[in-house]
Regions:
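Conserved PLP-enzyme active-site core in the AAT-like
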Residues: 2-104
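PLP-dependent enzyme catalytic core of the Aspartate aminotransferase-like
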Residues: 91, 154-222
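Short acidic (Asp/Glu) and glycine-rich catalytic loops that position anionic groups and cofactors
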Residues: 47-52, 71-77, 110-117, 157-164, ...
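A glycine-rich phosphate-binding loop feature that marks nucleotide/adenosyl-phosphate handling sites
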Residues: 71, 88-94, 110-120, 151-153, ...
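Conserved PLP-binding catalytic core of the aspartate aminotransferase-like
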Residues: 106-171
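Buried hydrophobic positions in well-ordered alpha/beta secondary-structure cores of metabolic enzymes
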Residues: 1, 24, 38-39, 70, ...
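Flexible, glycine/charged-enriched surface loops at secondary-structure junctions
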Residues: 61-64, 81-88, 100, 104-111, ...
Length: 222
């Protein structure tokens, strides 16, 4: 399964498992940036068995609009610009991880070679859930996650997971990712300090405004 890394494989910045696996599955969202869904890749004799197993017992009618959206996503992934995007995703993730480590946070695995990283916040006296809540309060999205040999239960956890795909799509670069790492570190170091939270939330809002999801003209603005 290459659900998380399909876009990086398509962009040529991560090795492909397809030549080595009998069956490969992946999502069409995440780094591939298509609609929510999935796909199965295999040799014809195997894919016939997959299709027979799925339909009609486990799959309903096809959603043609989603199939069309997947086709567009695949077409975009063939463009040279998509390879540039994939490279930027990895560069941004490395910049984020490097700066977090400079600020004293441990990255499980010592860094990242793709778009995600797992940050150990338990070493700072926080649970993953508390860190998640504190970061969400200043509009920094993440999710709690267990770390290896975690002594906390899953709903508490000792880590948070971060990724660079969405912010790269918005146009943020390595400089902004280093700044995001500073904001995260500031919050982790002082999760209950309202003055720190207020400052960080304001700076996050300014950054988000500088990299809008849509141009004003695309949503009926001036």
């Amino acid at each position: 399964d290459m659900a998380h890394i399909a876009g990086l494989v398509a962009g040529g910045v991560h090795p492909s498992p397809v030549p080595h696996a009998d069956v490969t599955t992946f999502t069409t969202h995440k780094t591939l940036r298509g609609p929510r869904g999935g796909a199965v890749v295999a040799e014809l004799d195997v894919i016939k068995k997959v299709n027979s197993a799925l339909f009609p017992g486990g799959q309903g009618g096809p959603l043609m609009h989603v199939i069309a959206a997947k086709a567009i996503a695949f077409k975009e992934a063939l463009a040279p610009e998509f390879s540039e995007y994939a490279r930027a995703v990895v560069e941004n993730a490395k910049a984020l991880a490097d700066r977090l480590q400079e600020r004293g946070l441990r990255i499980v695995s010592g860094g990242t070679d793709n778009h995600v990283m797992l940050v150990d916040v338990g070493s700072k006296g926080l649970s993953g859930r508390d860190a998640e809540d504190a970061l969400h309060a200043v509009d920094l999205t993440c999710n709690k996650n267990l770390i290896p040999y975690d002594e906390r239960p899953p709903m508490e956890a000792s880590g948070v997971r971060l990724g660079s795909a969405a912010i790269t799509t918005r146009g943020l670069g390595t400089r902004e990712c280093a700044q995001i790492a500073d904001w995260i570190s500031d919050i982790i170091e002082a999760p209950t300090d309202e003055s720190v939270a207020s400052r960080v939330k304001g700076e996050v809002a300014e950054c988000a405004a500088a990299f809008p999801i849509y141009e004003a003209s695309e949503v009926g603005g001036a």
